[in-house]
Amino acid sequence: MTSIDLNCDLGEGFGPWQMGNDAAMIELATSVNIACGFHAGDADIMHQTVKLAKARGVAVGAHPGFRDLHGFGRRPVPGITAAEIENLVAYQIGALQAVAALAGHKVSHVKAHGALSNVACEDDMTARAIAAAIKAVDPKLVFVVLASSKLQTAGEAAGLTLAHEVFADRAYEDDATLVSRKKPGAVLHDPIEIAERVLRMVQDGAVLSVTGKLIKLRTDTVCIHGDTAGAVEIARGLRARLAQAGITVAPFARG
């Protein structure tokens, strides 16, 4: 029987401000990626999110991004060096590891956020710096990468275990990169369309680009963004469609 992981980015509020419905999404995901205080999140939110994950038996991962609360980590940082990237990634992983220990859980994986991930998918230096930081902190951590990207290449070169990620609610360009959020149609919202699209990804390892090109993608984990409008309904519909097709959902890694 085929099995797939469903991951979600959570803990992306700050102080009293909340982003998305973490409690509902964590009931539907099998892995979660927790903001570590740079693009969103704080110590209390991190701890609360880890506790929710532990109670549900959900795998926990660090979701490091650029230090950009105002821009939610979705803006590139021109001129940043490889050493600075290594430092900020290691810092955020370590922060979540400490908070997870306090909550009686362990960090199993790392997935870069927003602009950090987008830049790394196309820039060798950024991708290698992220991989180097993960390897230095704990080489057993699974590195979640966009399939067929420079992140994948860097992770392989570093000898890390990889989980190849596809996105349920994002459109793809012909080169297998994600369509920029600045473009119309970049984010998908129809639960039925998304469920059928993901089913094809899981069963056939393929997705149609915005121009209709068939792109082959290895699929280990499917991301559903918790801040996408209707995220809970999308996740419920996806799980139901996968179950209907005889596909189980399970974490790709455990801490």
From Swiss-Prot:
The reaction(s) catalysed by this protein are: 5-oxo-L-proline + ATP + 2 H2O = L-glutamate + ADP + phosphate + H(+)
Question: In which organism is this protein found?
Answer: Rhodopseudomonas palustris (strain BisA53)
Q: Which PANTHER family match?
A: 5-OXOPROLINASE SUBUNIT A, UNCHARACTERIZED PROTEIN YBGL-RELATED
Function, as annotated, reads:
Catalyzes the cleavage of 5-oxoproline to form L-glutamate coupled to the hydrolysis of ATP to ADP and inorganic phosphate.
Q: What SUPFAM superfamilies has UniProt attached to this entry? A: Glycoside hydrolase/deacetylase
Entry's transmembrane regions: none
Which family, according to UniProt?
Answer: Belongs to the LamB/PxpA family.
The EC class name is hydrolase
The protein's matches in CDD domains, at most eight in alphabetical order, are given as: LamB_YcsF_like
Entry's InterPro entries? Glyco_hydro/deAcase_b/a-brl (IPR011330), LamB/YcsF/PxpA-like (IPR005501)
What does the record give under GO molecular function?
Answer: 5-oxoprolinase (ATP-hydrolyzing) activity; ATP binding
Tell me which domain of life the UniProt entry assigns to the organism this sequence originates from. Bacteria
The subunit structure is: Forms a complex composed of PxpA, PxpB and PxpC.
Q: What is this protein called?
A: 5-oxoprolinase subunit A
